[in-house]
Amino acid sequence: MQPTMRIIVSMALLAYAVASAYHSNVKLRRDGKMVLYPFPRVGRASGNTWQLPLNDLYPEYEPAQVKRQLYAFPRVGRDPVMSRLGRSDLSRVESHEFQPMAVRRTESPGMWFGPRLGRAFKNDDDEITIQNESNDHSEPEQTELIHEDRRKRQTLN
C-alpha cells in the first residue's frame, strides 16, 4: 500500500475506535447537571433542628440508609433574622404579624410596571397616520377579528 493510503486507513480506524469508546463508555459525561444530587434536600429552619432523632421519624429504616438518602442543606439566601429564629418563634411568623400590608389603589392612571405598560387611557399621539398613501403598500391589519362560520368536515364512517 502507498503511505498516504496507510495514513488514511489508520486515521479512519482510529476515529472509529475513539467514537465507539466514546459512545459505549459506562462513565457518564460531566456537564453542568452532574454535580447535583438526585436526593431530597432537607432544609433546617434553625440550629436547634439540626440534630433530629432519625429513629423516631423513620422507625422502619436503618439509620445508615436514611442518612444516605437525605442531605441537610442550610437555607441559603434567606433573611438572617428568620434563620436565627427558634422553633418556638416560628408560630409567631405564621401569625398575622408578618403578613404583607394591603396595597392602596389610586385612581390615577400612572405607570405600573414601567413605561408603556399598563396604560389605562389612549393618547391622541397614539393614532397611526399613513403619510404616503399609494397602491404599492398593503392594507393595515384589522384590529377586530371577523368571526366566520366554519363547516364541519365530512368524514367517512
From Swiss-Prot:
Annotated positions of the Valine amide modification: 42, 76
Keywords: Amidation, Cleavage on pair of basic residues, Neuropeptide, Pyrrolidone carboxylic acid, Secreted, Signal
Sequence intervals crossing the membrane: none
InterPro entries, sorted: Pyrokinin_CS
Bias kind Basic and acidic residues: ranges: 134-151
Modified residues (Leucine amide): 85, 117
UniProt-annotated stretches for the region Disordered: 131-157
Sequence positions bearing Pyrrolidone carboxylic acid: 69
Cellular localization per UniProt: Secreted
Residue numbers covered by the propeptide annotation in the UniProt entry: 22-28, 45-66, 120-157
GO molecular function, one term: neuropeptide hormone activity
Tissue: CAPA-periviscerokinin 1: Expressed in corpora cardiaca (CC), corpora allata (CA), antennal lobe (AL) and gnathal ganglion (GNG) (at protein level). Expression detected in most animals in CC and CA and in some animals in AL and GNG (at protein level). CAPA-periviscerokinin 2: Expressed in corpora cardiaca (CC), corpora allata (CA), antennal lobe (AL) and gnathal ganglion (GNG) (at protein level). For non-pyroglutamate form, expression in AL detected in all animals, in CC, CA and GNG in most animals (at protein level).
Recorded GO CC terms: extracellular region
Keyword match Secreted: yes
Annotated GO biological process: neuropeptide signaling pathway
Cleavable signal peptide: 1-21
Family: Belongs to the pyrokinin family.
UniProt name for this protein: CAPA peptides
Organism lineage string: Eukaryota, Metazoa, Ecdysozoa, Arthropoda, Hexapoda
